[in-house]
């Protein structure tokens, strides 16, 4: 307990004297929390403070006192239950208490084991620990609600393409919404056999599917970029935090960023500022963030070297996506270099998923094979390769709902099998 708590327990105004009184009736290990002096642990004799094991702390900002005691106890017990020395138990306790009081909130501010070990090993130069970006990144990325070993995302968040097809077929946005519900049903029907299936769907043309998806335990990605706009434009980009605060917490914010290192300087700065603002908004609202880099656009081909340079640039800006979504490159060396670079900057990232870019399944065989040795690559987020044929035929009234679902289901299953074969 704190000095005040020991004074109450022992009935004395002097803390040491109070602890002596308590020692007469208990042989337990006593821990006294002494604020800025750290803590002192007494295993036996309590004749003076030097008889105990004192573990100091450095001065930090006390931002929030709620939960400090429980945090301290959690840290001490972490060491105690594993048979650590009392000094080590106290180091854990002090660190957990310090991190708790330096952040807003109570239990959510407590560190993960990885964060705790990092803080004890390297400390922080910040007086306000919550302003230590490295520490905050570790806190965020090691306390995620769900960790994914694989992710097979059926992406049907496309809007411009669906509107073009619907226009040619004299169909409405309501028809598109119905089709996207069929796509969701495909994902749900396969989830029993492939539990790592997820979806990417928008709330403009696919709102019904997006709402129904919440009934199932699956990964849900949701786009925030305005479809078909170049340069990059974000929905409600003037008030992103307020906008995202309305999203369910399990919706991963996805942004498709058409960017290249050889864009003109003004455009590069504009895009970087938008993505940085979006990233900060996601952290403010506790939403995970998926960054999709597209270098092949406006008649320019995919450029693997630029993808790596863009990833490097985003880390320089302090942007740490929870997921990277990368163009389908066939080069093994590219994937090796990309994963090594991501790991060196953010070892706790969820991982990388490969996008399809409307390529055929034969192409994806080569891409998946090129990624096979990289554990950081968790799967794919592919759309048109799966739904294009079914969507066009369905919008033209050439096939039924069940037929459309069968086409999409078979293609999605085949992609998953191709992925699994590349890993065997």
Which positions does each model-derived feature cover?
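Anion (oxyanion) recognition and catalysis
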Residues: 94, 214, 276-279, 283
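Conserved, mostly hydrophobic/aromatic
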Residues: 154, 292, 324, 383
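Alpha/beta catalytic barrel-like cores
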Residues: 126-267, 320, 350, 361-371, ...
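Alpha/beta enzyme core
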Residues: 181-188, 238-252, 267, 274-275, ...
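Short beta-strand/loop segments at the ligand-binding rim of alpha/beta enzyme cores
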Residues: 217-220, 285-289, 345-360
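Domain-level signal for soluble alpha/beta catalytic cores
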Residues: 146, 160, 259-262, 297-305, ...
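A generic structural signal for short hydrophobic patches within well-formed alpha-helices
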Residues: 5-7, 39, 116, 387
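Conserved phosphate-binding/catalytic region of the ribokinase-like
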Residues: 12-133
